[in-house]
């Protein structure tokens, strides 16, 4: 069974990272739509094999209203191998699509620079997928006030790639393993594994306080809401809550200090903010969590006043282990990403401070 542990390793990638740029831009009014000038011809490759025609066009025609896409298909203007096609037609390798001119809405800010190309540390790569070690503070995709994220930057860094799509997501503040599919078949197979809970995802989390050794399973329902600005908020609700979703986290105590505990948390369900809300609800929020944590303690930690001699300005949540079946051959793959340097430095400072206390 392939097993990548410890340092970052790469199968096929030797690219270098490009300097990061600002992640967000203020929104501006959208300009008028523009009309494509001529008929477009597209030949289907492995990246789109098996995809429905309507779904392919919705992705290919960025900025075209969904209703217009279906209207064009129904009119017969979209042709596959010179013949009319229905919206649910499955595409095959070698199919030639004839696409009529369509009116597209340009980007929200026409003067905004495109996402700067950027490579990320690669833990695993082959013809089907890429596993990267995402840094904290980087969104996985653009939206909600974020101009771009990992996927937009990766596409810019690899213009030769015909297909790059996120298999799953990580919170912006969370670092660690993130899968990107290089083929649609791989995307479908991997997302199916995630839906059926056949993957193993373990996170390293430093929490405030001393975690009780007897608490090893957290089984609490969660309810997600969106505020007027579109920001997500998650809270624990009763098991019989009409809109609550059962959420299970398995907890293993790794190391404890007087004021903090390092945990390994394996999620059996993949709810939004699951680990963060579960731990905070039990009185042990993730260190540095800006949404569910303690603001004053976060500020003290960032200023080096919580752990003497060590400033820590991020959330300590790291997706460190990921286990799944390879979409091409069913082989079990287990990947690990070591703790980022800043997290390791905080652990070392906690050890040093505890030793100093004992000596006194």
Describe these PLM feature segments:
Residues 1-360:
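RNA pseudouridine synthases
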């Amino acid at each position: 069974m392939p097993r990548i542990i410890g340092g970052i390793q790469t199968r096929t990638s030797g690219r270098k990272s490009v300097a990061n740029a600002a992640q967000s831009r203020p929104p501006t009014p959208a300009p008028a739509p523009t009309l494509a000038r001529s008929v477009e011809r597209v030949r289907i490759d492995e990246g789109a094999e098996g995809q429905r025609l309507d779904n392919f066009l919705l992705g290919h025609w960025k900025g075209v209203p969904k209703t217009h896409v279906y209207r064009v298909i129904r009119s017969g203007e979209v042709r596959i191998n010179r013949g009319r096609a229905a919206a649910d037609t499955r595409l095959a390798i070698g199919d030639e699509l004839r696409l009529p001119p369509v009116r597209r809405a340009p980007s929200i800010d026409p003067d905004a620079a495109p996402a700067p190309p950027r490579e990320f540390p690669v833990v695993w790569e082959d013809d089907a997928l890429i596993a990267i070690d995402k840094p904290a503070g980087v969104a996985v995709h653009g939206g909600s006030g974020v101009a771009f994220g990992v996927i937009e930057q990766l596409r810019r860094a690899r213009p030769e790639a015909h297909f790059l799509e996120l298999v799953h997501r990580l919170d912006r503040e969370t670092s660690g393993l993130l899968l990107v599919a290089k083929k649609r078949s791989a995307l479908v197979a991997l997302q199916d594994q995630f839906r059926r809970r056949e993957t193993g995802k373990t996170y390293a989390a430093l929490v405030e306080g001393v975690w009780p050794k007897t608490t090893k399973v957290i089984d609490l329902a969660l309810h997600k809401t969106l505020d007027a600005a579109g920001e997500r908020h998650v809270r624990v609700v009763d098991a019989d809550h009409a809109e609550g979703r059962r959420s299970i986290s398995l907890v293993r105590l790794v190391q404890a200090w007087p004021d903090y505990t390092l945990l390994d948390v394996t999620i059996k369900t993949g709810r939004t903010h699951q680990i963060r809300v579960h731990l905070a609800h039990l009185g042990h929020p993730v260190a540095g969590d800006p949404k569910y944590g303690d603001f004053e303690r976060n500020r003290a930690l960032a200023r080096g006043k919580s752990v003497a001699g060590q400033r820590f300005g991020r959330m300590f949540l790291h997706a460190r282990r990921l286990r799944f079946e390879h979409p091409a051959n069913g082989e079990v793959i287990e990947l690990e990403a070591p703790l980022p340097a800043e997290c390791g430095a905080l652990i070392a400072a906690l050890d040093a401070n505890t030793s100093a206390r004992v000596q006194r």
